[in-house]
Amino acid sequence: MRDAYAIKQSVGIPVICTGGFQTASVVRDALNRGVCDGVSIARSLIADNDLVELWRRGYDRAPRPCTYCNKCLANATENPLGCYEESRFDSREEMVAQIMSVFEPAPFPQPAMTPAE
């Protein structure tokens, strides 16, 4: 954030800082101290598309934050944008369901949900 602050002091336009913001407290700190005018949370949102809602409800960090594996970027040219880090999910099916959840209606038939045993 030191570099973002130096840039902000040198230019007369808004500065957006990137660099792995995943916690509400760090985002608030950067904005409150005037380090930058905004932050980019792209990968954090890809990993947890409800991150801002979690922050609004008082959570500082998502339960399974982005691991910075970059699999989202590696898959983006041929597959839907989403988190492909299987270790963040209980199963591959859960991962695929989250990735495909942006499509409404789903592009292919979904299996019927059964109650957990």
Model-derived features: where do they sit?
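Flavin-dependent oxidoreductase catalytic cores
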Residues: 1-117
